[in-house]
Every structure is written in C-alpha cells, then in structure tokens.
C-alpha cells in the first residue's frame, strides 16, 4: 500500500527571517548614506567619469578691475600679453627681494617646492574635473537674473518651480588635493601686485584720467583674474576684494573707507552697530537690537557696492567666453563674493577662509531653489577651525576684528563646508593670523595628505538677538492709540485711557527669524 508522503511546510525559521530583515535594513542604510556622494559627482559610477584630469592647463589670460564707491562706474580689462607677464615677473622678484628684509612680511607665493616659480603670472595650473548634477535656474542671463532678484519679474508659484532644472555640468573635483591647492593658488594670485603698465581697455565708460594711477590695485576696487583652459573651454575667475589693514592675508597693508564700508555692510548684523561708540556704515539702525531690513537690502544692492561690482566683472567674463564653463574662486572677502556670484548665476564656486555669507545671500534675495538637497549645490567652503574669521568667532568688543574696526558678525555658510581640524591635529590655537592665504596653503592644504571632506553645515542662525522690521516706520505704525469708556454704578463717570495694542501679530517666520506672515 502506497503511503502519501506529507508535504513539507515552506516556512523559514524566525532566525532565518531575522537575518534577511537585518541585511535588508543594512543595505538600505548604506544606500542612503552613499547616495549624496554618488549624486554629488554626477550619475556615472565609473572612476574615470568621477575623476578626470583636464587635457589642458589653466593660464592667466586677462585681468578685470572695477571701482567701488565714487569710482563705481569705472571698469577696465587688461589682456595678459608676454610683455605684461615679463613686467609682472620683474616686479614680483623685486618685491620678493625687498620682503626678505621683513620677518613678518606675508609671502607672495607658496614656499612648497612642487609649485615653485619665479613668476606667478606665467604659472600653468592643472585641475581635475568631475561631473556634477546641479540644480540651477534654467534662464541665467544676467538681465533676467537681476530683474528676478530685484523683484521686477512676476511669476506664479508653479512658474517659479518650473524655472529650476537639474543640470549636468562640469565642476572642479574638490576631493582632489592638487585641485584644491591649485584653486587656492589662483586665489592668492589675485593678491600679487601687477605693474601699472599695459593696454587697459575700458569695459564701460572712458576712464577718468584724473583718477590716481594706482586705482584698483592697492586700495579702491575689486579685481578679477581670468584663467582659461583652451582645450577644455573652462574658465576660472579668481576674485580679490580691497585691501584691509589689520586683517592678515588681505594683500597690501593699506585700507580705504570703501573697504570697511562694504565689509561691515556684508558681514555685520546691522551696519556695524556694535556699540554706541561705533560709527555705522549705513542708516538702517533703528534702536537697540532693532534694524530696518528693507534699508539693509537697498544698501547691499547699490551700484557702488561690492556685489554689483563683482556682477559687472562676471558680465565681462561671460561676454569674453560666452560658451565656456565658468568656475569662481577666492580667499576671504573674495571667497564670499565668489560664493555670492556662484549662487546668483548657478556657477561652481570654491571659497577659502571666507566669512559667513548666508546672511548677505538672504538679504540680496539670491536664488535658492525650493527643496534643494545640499549635495546638489555647487558651493564649497574650505577652511580650518583655528581661523576666527572663517569660524565666525571674530566678533565682540575685545576681538581682533573689532579692534581694527571690522564687525565680522556672521558665521553661517551656504553650500557645503570643508573644515580641517588643525586645533586637534596640529595643536593650533585660534588666531587671526591663521587666516593668511599662504599659511593656509603651505601648512593646511599641503599639510594634509587628503582634501578635507565637504559636509552640510550644522544648523546655524546669525544675529539671533536682533529684531529686523520691514521698515523704519513699521513699528510706530503698528501701534494704535485708542480711547475707551468705562462705566461704574451707582454714579456714571467717563474716563479716557490710552491703550497700546498691536495691530498685527507675526504668525509665521522663516528659519532666519524674519517674519513672513502677519495676522491682524
């Protein structure tokens, strides 16, 4: 008699199911953490696409200089010819020889033998590139962008979302140590003095011959050095701001009123109103820890300020290289301006030791795409934690910055930050002299075997104790004086009392603390 074998139950043991579930969760976690790094260098996973060496080299091709303040209409371009390079090399060697007599003289170039040269303006830079999936505006024409920033272009919420695209672009490989060092050297190149010779061409109106010959070089303007790779059709714009006495690493030890006005306007909470002893750089201060927000925005947008000047320089570069990929870089103030420029036009920007530029980015109403993941941004801030300017701690009445008249009160950066922990690794103490560009290059960027990892900044709020009102008259107009009548028994009396009530209440604030929605 045949017996039917009992069917086996196809059920896994609880231990088996637990192992499968654990492995699945671990795979999902690994995928989640690897996704930003994957997307940050593009959609391709091949090593060749992630890290590509440029076929050509970057050489200095032209220099722009733009006035600020009373000279803000002045804008010139110099083509870097062999004659200019030769004259610059002679001046560099002469300046270097003279600087050897002073122990505290800031070096004009790195002391590293790998990058040694007798003429920084004839140096050829090698940069590695990487693909980057970047979210930026579809329409990036300067005229459209300016109308968008100034609120002259009306669009619905759907139209505003549709104007952002995911764009595959070429960006500098910020994970490559040599590329980071080369970009820092390009930033330092903008500090090296140029002989006041050459065929300067007026970009805007004719140059005023009564202006001093050293305009734009030593104290009263912004300079942009243009490096070009003819093979890859890539431009690197290195930005330098004005010199700053007392702030090391800012080039010449000279200063102007325009320098402090613009620095204090960009990086202070309210017109450099540190205390009653300070002279403010604008008239937006209302009263104790209260500031006119609309006034600040207008001051930053003025044509004689830094931001407008650097936008004009970018327009000149764009006209010169209309089809090229453009990257921007800079150190300190130049790095902050590079970041603002990159934010405005959707350009990859690499900044070194720059002050926090999130606050001026918001005040200028620069484009921030909705729901933007940090790994889809093209802005990187390199710095170390022994630099109080970069870390946002160079403030307060007794700080080094305050003692020389600078209100560096911002600490928050946009994009990603790439911080070297020199305090723990090298035993450095926080000191303003650690801000110097060549100290950063020689002892930090070249002092580590790898470039610092770039991560999303920690949650940060600038000027948390300040109140920013829509306008100077808003606070007084929001209070009403009303008359009320009260009746008492058995006799009826009438009295008039003044009651102060608020006509509106803030029911919604953005993450910077500004009120965005009011309720009556």
Curated annotation (Swiss-Prot):
One Pfam family hit: Lipase_3
Subcellular location: Endosome, Multivesicular body membrane; Prevacuolar compartment membrane
Entry-listed glycosylation sites: 173, 202, 208
Enzyme Commission number: 3.1.1.3
CDD domains referenced in this protein's UniProt entry, alphabetically: Lipase_3
Gene Ontology MF terms in the entry: phospholipase activity; triacylglycerol lipase activity
Lumenal side: 36-520
Cytoplasmic side: 1-14
Active-site residues annotated for this sequence: 332
GO cellular component: multivesicular body membrane; vacuolar lumen
One GO-annotated biological process of the protein: multivesicular body membrane disassembly
Transmembrane segments: 15-35
Entry membrane topology: Single-pass type II membrane protein
Reactions this protein catalyses: a triacylglycerol + H2O = a diacylglycerol + a fatty acid + H(+)
Function summary: Lipase which is essential for lysis of subvacuolar cytoplasm to vacuole targeted bodies and intravacuolar autophagic bodies. Involved in the lysis of intravacuolar multivesicular body (MVB) vesicles. The intravacuolar membrane disintegration by ATG15 is critical to life span extension.
Family in the record: Belongs to the AB hydrolase superfamily. Lipase family.
Subunit relationships: Binds to both phosphatidylinositol (PI) and phosphatidylinositol 3,5-bisphosphate (PIP2).
Protein name: Putative lipase ATG15
Native source species: Saccharomyces cerevisiae (strain YJM789)
